[in-house]
Regions:
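Gly/serine-rich nucleotide phosphate-binding loop at the start of the catalytic core
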Residues: 1-73
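Short N-terminal helix-initiation segments at or just after the protein's N-terminus
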Residues: 32-47, 80-83, 123-132, 225-229, ...
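Hydrophobic, Leu/Ile/Phe/Ala-enriched alpha-helical segments that form helix-helix packing faces
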Residues: 37-38, 85-90, 173-177
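A common structural microfeature
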Residues: 43-46, 57, 95-100, 139, ...
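Active-site-proximal, Lys/Arg-enriched surface segment
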Residues: 65-147, 246-250
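Contiguous, well-ordered alpha-helical segments that form the cores/surfaces of helical PPI scaffolds
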Residues: 32-37, 140-143, 335
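Single, function-defining residue in the core of a domain
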Residues: 1-18, 94, 112, 146-366
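Structural motif
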Residues: 22-30, 128-134, 322-332
Length: 366
């Protein structure tokens, strides 16, 4: 049986995914960076690329910070090809198409007041993971998935040039093909009327967590979700089991503040029924879905948290060392492209971490 090396695989991948518009040198550098990132101990430093690739570390640093290559077109192509790959799987298998949107913080060391070349674009951001404000870069991400397959659709730095996180979310939605019927999954920070309107304009459905103080209008009476939950008799809730866990759920369907009509689920873990701190609220724009299906679909949002952990662990996003903001923006694009390659570029579709380890093993054995 013919054995195809990782270098041959990635050249084939670039051709099949229509990345041949890049000239030979940018293609070569991108391929070297992607393949270097699969090696054990990779930390996202230019010295890692220099040790694994044929060029010096400064060559890769210059390529990311100042190299002349069409990163905008590469981003558009990577988005289109990733979406098309998952969309075709969804149609073939008859499984729903999900797009999860979230953000994370990449912590960095606070620079000294005397630092002459501090890292560009870093600032203070609230980290949900650490539960406090930390110094670093905030990254906005979107993944597209169906079944057991998920690909990185977008990975961009939060900065004034890109607008607010809501602006970046709206830009993601505008970039999607029309009438895909996808379910857009997000946490309570992103669930708002403008995002819902953008989803509906694209023929998509929104399933998002909501803050418990959001205003509902049961029987025309203005009240918050938390107050409504507290006023209901326990008998109004019914059990819903999702992935082995049981929740007590009340379904509200009607208007919200600035939203004409949607489904809202008030949910408690069965063991914490009635506890105010345990209340979770979810909004769904697709009224045809059952309560169980809404919660099951929303559980797919966890995939983006797994992606953040994998990129920090394997792709060096936790320890990268580039100073220029442009270099980081391009590095994030390369990480998204690498995710695509390790998931789909080795002859068959596999989870990202499995593809990365397969590529690593092939290098060791070659």
């Amino acid at each position: 049986m013919e054995i195809i090396t990782p270098r041959e695989q990635i050249r084939k991948f670039f051709f099949e995914k229509h990345l041949e518009f890049l000239t030979s040198v940018p293609q070569q550098r991108l391929q070297e960076i992607i393949l270097s990132s699969c090696m054990k101990g990779h930390s996202g430093k230019m010295s890692d690329y220099g040790e694994c690739g044929p060029a010096h570390r400064t060559t890769y640093g210059h390529f990311l910070a100042k190299g002349k290559w069409d990163d905008k077109r590469l981003e558009e192509t990577q988005k289109r090809e990733s979406f098309q790959t998952v969309s075709e799987l969804s149609r073939r298998d008859g499984t729903p198409l999900f797009i999860s949107i979230d953000d994370t913080v990449l912590p960095k060391t606070v620079p000294s007041s005397k630092a002459k070349r501090p890292t560009q674009g870093a600032g203070w951001h609230y980290s949900h993971l650490e539960g406090k404000v930390v110094y670093g870069h905030q990254v906005h991400a979107a993944i597209v998935g169906t079944g057991d397959t998920s690909l990185c659709y977008s990975l961009k730095r939060c900065c004034p040039e890109n607008g607010t996180k809501i602006d970046m979310t709206l830009e993601i939605l505008r970039s999607l093909p029309n009438q895909t019927g996808a379910y857009i999954l997000m946490d309570s920070w992103y669930t708002n009327p403008s995002v819902l309107d953008a989803c509906q304009e694209k023929g998509c459905h929104l399933i998002g967590a909501m803050k418990t103080n959001r205003i509902l209008f049961p029987e025309g009476k203005r009240t918050s979700a938390s107050d409504l939950a507290a006023s209901l008799d326990p008998g109004c809730f019914h059990p819903v089991t999702v992935k082995g866990r049981t929740y007590m759920v009340y379904r509200y369907e009607g208007p919200l503040n600035k939203i004409d009509h949607a489904v809202v689920l008030l949910s408690y873990p069965a063991a914490a029924m009635g506890r105010k701190c345990a209340l979770r609220v979810f909004l769904c724009s697709d009224s045809t879905l059952s309560d169980e299906t809404i919660l099951e679909y929303y559980s797919h949002r966890w995939t983006i948290e797994v992606l953040f952990r994998a990129h920090k662990r394997y792709m060096g996003l936790k320890s990268f060392m580039v100073r220029a903001a442009k270099a980081l923006d391009r590095l994030l694009l390369v990480v998204a492209l690498a995710h695509f390659f390790f998931s789909c570029g080795l002859g068959h579709i596999v989870p990202f971490h499995i593809g990365l380890h397969l590529c690593r093993t092939a290098f060791v054995n070659s």
